[in-house]
């Protein structure tokens, strides 16, 4: 087998949550270009339809379902829909996420719980549902963040705690499932990428962070999608329990 062939995902079925915008769109498009069929979940159905159109344009099959990952039943229903449509789930991209920037002394219990419910609890419910049906050779990729490893000048305790939790959960699920079930579990920890979420940050914030990024620029979403394709493909077959940092060198400064 040639090295390039190891990066192909022909015939694989990939679930992407948070597929209506931002990195989720790039993940869906990237996996479609690598040969996979897609099952998309998101709360914003109209925007998710645009993502589905990109998958179809790449010549791949696609199924969409409105999904709020804070609800374990909706997570199970998304996986059930994938099984009904395609008969298998090979890859989960646990991408659904929200963020806030609220000083710790002013953050309400509702604000804190809302972030953790999506970013950590929702990722767990999706992994749990997929873990029930995945066969050996399957893969889960949890989307964490460099803010689970470091700080970046904004008051984001809830977001940072949730993403640090994702990193810990990734290691434990890998320990539980990789040997016994043959399911690899890894995380990606992105730095700053050009997405809708970064567009919503306060004016001047990203400019203030650029000096910390060794490569001197924000990431392109396609670069993160390519990393996910590698990690999910046979090329990444000897990697499990790891958090792959994709941040342009932010965390080494």
Model-derived regions: residue spans:
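Short C-terminal tail/terminal secondary-structure segment
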Residues: 2-6, 150, 228-229, 240-253
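Conserved glycine-rich cofactor-binding loop
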Residues: 20-21
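Substrate-binding pocket helix/loop in short-chain dehydrogenase/reductase
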Residues: 103-104, 108-116, 198, 209
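Active-site helix of classical SDR
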Residues: 127, 162, 170
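Alpha-helical segment proximal to the catalytic Tyr-Lys
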Residues: 132, 175-179, 237
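Residue(s) in the substrate-gating loop at a strand-loop-helix junction
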Residues: 145
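Short, small/polar-rich loop/turn modules that mediate ligand/substrate recognition or access, typified
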Residues: 179-184, 239-241
